[in-house]
Amino acid sequence: KIKTMKYLSFNIDNINAGKILFDFYEKTGDGRYKVAMDTLRKQLAEQPRTSEGGFWHKLIYPHQMWLDGIFMASPYLAQYGNVFKDTTVNADIMNQIKLIARKTYDPKTGLFYHGWDESKTQNWANKETGCSPNFWSRSIGWYAAAVVDVLDYMPAQFEGRDSIMTIINTLAEGIVKYQEPETGVWWQVTDQNNRKGNYLESSASSLFVYFLCKAVNKGYIPVEYKAAAERGFNGLIKQFIKEEPDGSYTITNCCAVAGLGGKGNRDGSFAYYIGCLLYTSDA
């Protein structure tokens, strides 16, 4: 049991923070950490799913998969399976990654929409595809980071690996396509460039740089992407890192939060995403 966890909310955001428990358990052997890890694993075993097995984002967001959710759950599940020799998780992880790619990928832009509603009933959902209407950079960054992170815990060869490599290379191509040429970083709404109100956003840019660097280092994408990764890293420092008078540093232009549906007018529109609060040193 995790004392403050609202288990029956089936909030997939609960899972990601559990990754730190593996280190605590390894270093201390304290069984309480194992109980907490098992609790998170149990949530995923019981998580409501779409008809094709995709995790709902939360119980209050029925029939919906968001790109965010792949990052929140899949790396944890992959590490759990690796540490505790639970190979049953591998096929599930591959299904999550490939399913949301099929449902949210837009071949016209080379990008992935933020969310998908299987029921196609949400106010933000396209009535034909179920997709949300725009490309939120941080959600794409979360998805990209998740895909390269899960491979750390998967067997060297597994069924579906070629499909995952295709997704990684598709992500890299789309991300670099929309890299802002002067600064090397990325916009809050990925494909809207200099549209009035759009802004360069630090958390998404950081995730994109992380993904590109790791994918190049692991050999998942061609080494030619290294130049884009370096431009992005240098851009992060120049655009977003601010030294304070006391010698500390802050990261600027962090979108506080964005989602779909629920409370407020979270309709996935361009106006919604650019209207999200900006924080410093928070994402």
Where are these regions (language model features)?
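Carbohydrate-binding/catalytic loop surfaces
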Residues: 15-24, 55-69, 110-136, 183-204, ...
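Extracytoplasmic mature domains of secreted/periplasmic and thylakoid-lumen proteins
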Residues: 20, 29-72
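Long, well-ordered core segments of solenoidal/helical folds
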Residues: 1-7, 35-54, 90-123, 165-183, ...
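Conserved small/polar residues in nucleotide/adenosyl-binding loops
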Residues: 279-283
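Inter-helical turn/loop segments and adjacent helix faces that build the functional surface
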Residues: 80-88, 150-161, 218-222
